[in-house]
């Protein structure tokens, strides 16, 4: 496989397409009676790699992105997240992202289909440590400047 480092417009398009990976960290959760927690975090996107499986020079079916981003709360880095997003429909810009957030006290797994829309919804599919048995959803909003916000609603 050939690794391609993207620049310019291609990087911007793929960043919007493929960083549906959400981020969550040890932010102070807001507890509710049904044992739900809501975490509000900031996300700093890091460079990522597009693996061009068919060597055609652009995003196509089966190509994928590997990502690793930083998570912060109140201006302090408190975790990170990483994963992969294979392209499942290049015409529609559809990707299926899976990843894991590494946080103080445990990890949270996520996945889902997403597109280039600046707001992305993904499922929380489990966790370890203090997040063991967690489910829920995460909403990522890309701010267009290499940063984003993340709201994670956890249920047990």
Mark where each language-model region is.
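Bacterial N-terminal signal peptides that target proteins for export
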Residues: 1-11
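Signal peptide cleavage region of secreted peptide precursors
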Residues: 23-26
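Bacterial N-terminal signal peptides
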Residues: 9-21
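Beta-strand-enriched cores of mature, soluble protein domains
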Residues: 28-156
């Amino acid at each position: 496989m050939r690794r391609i480092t993207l620049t310019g417009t291609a990087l911007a398009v793929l960043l919007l397409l493929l960083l549906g990976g959400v981020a969550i960290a040890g932010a102070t959760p807001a507890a509710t009676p049904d044992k739900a927690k809501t975490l509000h975090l900031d996300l700093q996107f890091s460079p990522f790699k597009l693996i061009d499986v068919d060597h055609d020079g652009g995003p196509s079916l089966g190509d994928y992105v590997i990502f690793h981003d930083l998570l912060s709360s109140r201006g302090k880095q408190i975790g990170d997240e990483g994963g992969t997003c294979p392209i499942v429909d290049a015409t529609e810009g559809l990707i299926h992202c899976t990843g894991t957030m590494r946080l103080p006290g445990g990890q949270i797994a996520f996945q889902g289909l997403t597109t280039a829309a600046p707001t992305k919804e993904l499922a929380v599919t489990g966790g370890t440590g203090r997040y063991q048995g967690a489910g829920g959803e995460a909403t990522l909003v890309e701010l267009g400047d290499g940063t984003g916000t993340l709201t994670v609603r956890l249920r047990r």
